[in-house]
Amino acid sequence: MKAAIYYGRGDIRVEDVPRPNAVGLDDVLIAVSKAAICGSDSSEWDHGPVLAVAPVILGHEFVGVVEEVGSNVTTFAVGDRVVSGAGISCGTCEWCREGRTNLCAKYFTLGLQVNGGLSDYVVSPASICRSIPDDVDDVSAALAQPFAVALHGLRRARVRDGAGVAIIGVGGIGGFLVAGAVARGASPVIAIDIDDERLSGAKKLGATHAINATTEDATAMVLDITGGLGVHSVVEATGVQGNPQKALDMVRRGGDVLILGLHTRANQLDLLQFTLREVDLHGTLAHVCAEDLPEALAILASSNVAALVLDKVIGLDELVEDGIKPLAERRARGKIVVDLHRPVRRDAESKRG
């Protein structure tokens, strides 16, 4: 089978590798049809290894058809269309027993620590797979996993019907945050970014307001929109130093601040504000399959979110040049999906990029 193998920084190759021949008792073998590229894939190529254990087949946002089932699996049958979650949990630790499988003490990720779905076939635990509704095509379904990450974050931030939310950073996962907030009935939904094209996309996804933070005072505008009160929830999705404090400045008393962006440098925060205004600060990690994947699929089935967040569909042989590099260089205008059914050109096989 063909697979995209990560060997280290700047080194991803499409190669022929053996098809998985050992399906665990609780696993399913999936014939992959579509796989979206995650920002973490481009980060590993650009400046990794960070989380990836090379060599490894990349890909943790994928869908396909069940080809084989383990003997303990009763939830799926051969021929079922499924989407897989990304994280594998033990099911027995304290966090798993609480339903917080994303915090599992033995958590690891498909496509980073074990072989993933940028390949013709992949083995995935049946417990993290969900059936795809008939009215959701494979390209759309390939977006369910990143959408689930956004929905999990919104749940952590207590984004809800009738409550206002500001989203700082609406590229990549930010578009899903906007779509999820709109689907949950939040109002107003305020998109904040430094890119007018991304802000235009956020408006198409249903944001009620769009603020370019390079030309406008975002905090002042949020306060003006909310009559000086601030929004109920703020999601910081950029990882840019200083933005957590801005999030705190625009949230209302008793509100919620969620840090979704990955901050690799220390930030200064006015902790007195948290105390005097009783603001809750939250982190968020990945998603919980049982809660977030079904909601993502339901929204994708009932909306045009997929069409609005999709940049393009490419072949596996185009992965590096037309997928990984545009993401690493911030040229991508949305999600990029790989079609595993497109023939791989002979001149692309074993190509190093």
Regions found by a protein language model. Name each.
Residues A157, S200, K204-D280, D322, ...:
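Glycine-rich cofactor phosphate-binding loops and adjacent beta1-alpha1 units
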Residues S33-A35, S71, G87, T101, ...:
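Short, surface-exposed secondary-structure boundary micro-motifs
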Residues P20-A35, G48-E94, P133-D135:
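Glycine-rich beta-strand-centered segment in the early N-terminal region that forms part
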Residues V136-T215, A220:
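Mid-domain Rossmann-like dinucleotide-binding core that forms the NAD(H)/NADP(H) cofactor-binding site
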Residues Q245-D249, A290-G353:
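C-terminal hydrophobic helical "lid"/dimerization subdomain
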Residues D256, L269-V309:
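Rossmann-fold dehydrogenase core element
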Residues I88-I168:
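NAD(P)H dinucleotide-binding glycine-rich loop of Rossmann-like/cofactor-binding domains
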